[in-house]
Amino acid sequence: MAVPTELHGGSVKETAAEKESRVLEPGAAPFGNFPHYSRFHPPEQRLRLLPPELLRQLFPESPENGPILGLDVGCNSGDLSVALYKHFLSLPDGKTCSDASREFRLLCCDIDPVLVKRAEKECPFPDALTFITLDFMNQRTRKVLLSSFLSQFGRSVFDIGFCMSITMWIHLNHGDHGLWEFLARLSSLCRYLLVEPQPWKCYRAAARRLRKLGLHDFDHFHSLTIRGDMPNQIVQILTQDHGMELICCFGNTSWDRSLLLFRAKQTIETHPIPESLIEKGKEKNRLSFQKQ
């Protein structure tokens, strides 16, 4: 994906501005590792749909049993990770809380080391948010890094996982089986899972951007059989194949992506779903749960 500095048959060189323009072009981020993602999908659009008290509702026993442990997969430069952290702890802008890390600890991972480095540098809660470079599809590395984090708290799973606009990139780069495996691993690692799937139109747009830049197409795009209504497809895989249940649809962002909350069926039954989420979850009936 490197851009040549000199054209064949001539001595015309790209200017720094031209080179940066191509690097920052969305199509030049085939893993979704956009350098300024929050500029076109601001965190506030997600936060307005999520109740600030969500974690307190799901985990009323914390912090007596230790901090709530979260996993954010595909965290990019950490803007949304930090925003979610502040939102769920009701921390106003510009304010930190010395006790916050005892309530909620968040492990954030991304495939891009440059973005992870930026996230570490700019994070206002270094005691509570940990950023690591990780290709989540690398089984060996994933197991080592995630187990190392969980062992600090004597845990084997995370309380909640965040999968925000990452499913498409896994799907395009690893195919149908890769998406299935990705969701399998997440569901085995998290008691609850908040997923924001990209709709199929985003797949087509991502492929067009690559072609526009003259880059190699996604290896699996034309061979994908899991397609169409992607939120529904994600629901089918998680509920029918991976032992989770959809308990709430929080609605859609302004860019038409749904926020879906799942719960592992093996989660202790004495831990009831809050009534407010049950009522909110009736919105899920807007989704068609029939296989396509």
Swiss-Prot record:
Coiled-coil segments: none
GO cellular component assignments: cytoplasm
Keywords, sorted A to Z: Cytoplasm, Methyltransferase, S-adenosyl-L-methionine, Transferase
Subcellular location: Cytoplasm
Bin3-type SAM domain location: 53-274
Family under the similarity heading: Belongs to the methyltransferase superfamily.
Protein name per UniProt: RNA 5'-monophosphate methyltransferase
Species name: Pongo abelii
Gene assigned in the entry: BCDIN3D
